[in-house]
Amino acid sequence: MAEFVRAQIFGTTFEITSRYTDLQLVGMGAFGLVCSAKDQLTNQAVAVKKIMKPFSTPVLSKRTYRELKLLKHLRHENIISLSDIFISPLEDIYFVTELLGTDLHRLLTSRPLEKQFIQYFLYQILRGLKYVHSAGVVHRDLKPSNILVNENCDLKICDFGLARIQDPQMTGYVSTRYYRAPEIMLTWQKYDVEVDIWSAGCIFAEMLEGKPLFPGKDHVNQFSIITELLGTPPDDVIQTICSENTLRFVQSLPKRERQPLANKFKNAEPDAVDLLENMLVFDPRKRVRAEQALAHAYLAPYHDPTDEPVADEKFDWSFNDADLPVDTWKIMMYSEILDYHNVDAAVQEQENGS
C-alpha cells in the first residue's frame, strides 16, 4: 500500500504518494491544479495534476474518465505522456506526466519567435495532430497554453479533457474563442478533425505576428473579425448552419471579399503564407489535413514521412454516449488505473529481463 503525504498548495490539499516531493504550483485550471514535483524513483522533474472532486457529478466523472483513457491510449513524442496515476484516500485523482519548462503562450508573450523556431514548432504541432486524428480523436481546445515546450524546443500537446470522437453531432462552446473554428460557432452541430487545423493555423499566425489573429470580444465580434480577413463564407458553407438565429446573423453581415494573407503578413515568406492560406479556410472540407500540411514546402526542413507515425488502433469511444451514475464511473476509473499499473509493471519487467 502506497504511503500518502499531504501538502497545502494555494489553499488546496495535495494528497500524494511519498514518491513525489518538492511540490511547486505551476498552473491552475477550471478542473484542477498542476504542480511540479521531483520523482524520487526516477530523479526526474514531473508535473502532478490534481483533478478537483472528480466524482462530484456524473459529468465531471465522465470528463475525468475520458482524459484518463485518452492519456493511456495516445503514445507519441508530441503528445504529453502519462507516467503515473493514483487516487488518494480523499478520492481525488492525480495524473503524473513529464514536466516541460514552459508553454507557447508564455513564449509568445515574452519575445518574437525566429523563423526556424516557428517552423519547428508548427511541424511538431502538425506531427502530433496527424497521430491524434489517426486515432479518431479531435482535440477541440488547441491553443498556445495547451502546447508545452522544453529547453530543447521539444513540443508536446496537452490537456485532452475536452477531446471528443470524430464526427457525430458535436456540440458548440468548446475551445478558447480566439482559436475556435468557424464551424463550431456557426453550426454548433457537426464538426471533425479540421477544427484542430483551424486552431493550429491561428497559432501559426500568432507565431508569425506575435499577437492573436482573431481577438474577438464575443462570438459575434469574433465571427465578424474572421470575415474581415477571410471574406464572407461561401453559400454552401452558410447552408450547413443549423441554427436559424445564427443563419439570420450571418446573412445580415455585409458581403466581404477575402483579403490576400500576404498583405496581412508582410514579413512572412511566401511558403509560410501559402500554408496559412490552406489552414484558414472557411469550408472545413477544403481545409488542409495534418498529413498534407506536413508535406508542404514550408516544413521541408523537418518533414520526414518515415518518422511521422499514426496510431496503431482507433481510440475506443464506446463509453462516450453512456449516461452513467457516479458510482459506475468510479468503478470504471479504478479499473482503468489498475490496468495502467498492471501494464506498466509488465512493460518494466520485460525491459528488465531483456
Swiss-Prot record:
Presence of keyword Transcription regulation: yes
Motif extent (TXY): 171-173
Domain comment, as recorded: The TXY motif contains the threonine and tyrosine residues whose phosphorylation activates the MAP kinases.
Membrane-traversing stretches: none
Active site, per annotation: 141
Family: Belongs to the protein kinase superfamily. Ser/Thr protein kinase family. MAP kinase subfamily. HOG1 sub-subfamily.
Function: Proline-directed serine/threonine-protein kinase involved in a signal transduction pathway that is activated by changes in the osmolarity of the extracellular environment. Controls osmotic regulation of transcription of target genes.
Organism phylogeny: Eukaryota, Fungi, Dikarya, Ascomycota, Pezizomycotina
SUPFAM superfamilies from the UniProt entry: Protein kinase-like (PK-like) (SSF56112)
Protein name: Mitogen-activated protein kinase HOG1
Pfam families named among the record's database cross-references: Pkinase (PF00069)
Post-translational modification: Dually phosphorylated on Thr-171 and Tyr-173, which activates the enzyme.
Residue numbers carrying Phosphothreonine: 171
Residues with PTM Phosphotyrosine: 173
Top enzyme category: transferase
Superkingdom, natural source: Eukaryota
Organism for this UniProt entry: Cochliobolus miyabeanus (Brown spot disease fungus)
Activity regulation field: Activated by tyrosine and threonine phosphorylation.
